[in-house]
Design a protein with these regions (language model features):
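Phosphate-binding site of ATP-dependent enzymes
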Residues: 154, 182-275
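Conserved N-proximal alpha/beta basic substrate-recognition cap immediately N-terminal to
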Residues: 18-148, 164, 308
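Intrinsically disordered, low-structural-confidence terminal and linker regions
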Residues: 1-25
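Short, flexible loop/turn elements at secondary-structure junctions
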Residues: 131, 160-162, 176, 204-206, ...
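Glycine-rich phosphate-binding loop of ATP-grasp-fold ATP-dependent ligases
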Residues: 156-188
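A short catalytic or substrate-binding loop motif that flags glycine-/basic-rich loops and adjacent residues
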Residues: 150, 162-164, 216-220, 316-317
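Short catalytic/ligand-binding loop motif for oxyanion handling, primarily in non-cytosolic enzymes
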Residues: 134-138, 165-169, 234, 248, ...
């Protein structure tokens, strides 16, 4: 008990910047005093053991934001993330023994995820090569081996098989013997050294629909869709949003400076995008391409939502999943299913999600 308290106090000290004033995501509103902000955060800490890391993206700094209104949000972020993780480790829809046979491996191992989806006939990028322990564990016949990867014209994306938040991912292009990583000319030796430095998956690069490319052409901009399975086995979709990268970046992740925008029931974007603290606040248009978000229609949105709901029914050992779905000219393609998705992105664009709490008790 004492050890746990000491650890939390150390974490509180490391997060002391959260007690100060930061850039507001609602600059037009009247704001709380620093004393009120500190009071709110300390109340979170003593009630839950954590500060609220997304206090400002949620607009808690607005003077009009009451304690009751803050209570409509799922807070604090970190405690809920642990709860999501716990439920995906042992889905309450199973008994204690069955629940230990977790389905998380299908989400956390991107190679297994690919095999599972391909067997079921769901569209997902083809795996060209899987490098594990410094050796090519699996190679598609089109490349045959790690060395063969560089003797075939290809457009691919490489990522760590257990990676998160876009870390380590890069675009790989080979054409007439010229090799490029994220657009820059390089050598086969350099790429090979990078691939054997971790367990890497190399997949076909997804060509996105022109409506998505217009927002940011340098990366694949993906829908982030969320589903949760109740104890009766029914799957519910919630909190849809679009992740948009920044020009020059190979990934669209919020943690890499990307912009997230909520999606309404008709498949159109909300009127403002949100950036992660440290990268900016809000914007009504893309910072680089200047495409206005309000009412921007996304193709194949309803097809994408129906696809992930049907797939979650088959991944029944997962309690909840955050899906990354690309939109191509021919329809949705499932990139990943994340078992440690973040409520912060959803509430930053959709507002309070307290009505979902009963699924996570």
């Amino acid at each position: 008990m004492l050890h746990s308290l000491i650890l939390k106090l150390k974490w509180l000290v490391s997060c002391r910047k959260l007690l100060g004033r930061q850039a507001s995501y609602y600059p037009e509103a009247a704001h709380k005093s620093r004393l009120r902000i500190v009071h709110d955060q300390l109340r979170f800490f003593f009630k839950y053991g954590y500060l609220e890391e997304y206090y400002y993206p949620y607009g808690f700094d607005r003077a009009e934001m009451t304690r009751a209104q803050m209570g409509e949000y799922i807070v604090p972020y970190r405690a809920f993330l642990y709860r999501v993780d716990q439920l995906n480790f042992q889905n309450p829809g199973f008994d204690a023994y069955e629940g230990r046979m977790t389905g998380r491996v299908l989400n956390q191992d991107k190679f297994y995820f690919f095999l599972f989806l391909r067997q079921l006939g769901y569209p997902t990028p083809r795996v060209l090569l899987y490098v594990r322990g410094g050796k090519d564990l699996y190679a598609d016949p089109s490349v045959s081996s790690l060395e063969g990867l560089f003797s075939t014209d290809l457009d691919a994306f490489a990522k760590p098989v257990g990676g998160m938040m876009g870390a380590g991912g890069f675009r790989l292009q080979v054409r007439h013997g010229e090799i490029r990583v994220d657009g820059n000319v390089t050598t086969a030796e350099s790429v090979a050294a990078r691939l054997v430095s971790a367990d890497y998956l190399v997949q076909d690069y997804v060509v996105q629909h022109e409506r998505l490319s217009a927002l940011c052409p340098s990366c694949v901009n993906t829908l982030r869709l969320h589903t949760v399975m109740d104890q009766d086995g029914k799957v519910h979709a919630f909190g849809p949003l679009l992740r948009i990268g920044r020009v020059g970046n190979a990934v669209d992740n919020w943690a890499k400076g990307g912009v997230i925008v909520g999606i309404d029931k008709s498949g159109r974007l909300f009127d403002r995008g949100v950036m992660k603290p440290g990268y900016g606040t809000v914007t009504v248009e893309h910072p680089d391409t200047h495409v206005v978000f309000a009412g921007y229609e996304l193709p194949f949105y309803h097809e994408a939502e129906a696809m992930v709901v049907s797939l979650h029914r088959l991944m029944y050992r997962n309690h909840s999943i955050g899906w990354d779905v690309a939109i191509t000219p021919h329809g949705p393609v499932i990139i990943e299913g994340n078992d440690r998705w973040e409520i912060s992105m959803i509430q930053a664009v959709h507002g309070p999600m307290g009505h979902l709490k009963h699924y996570f008790q």
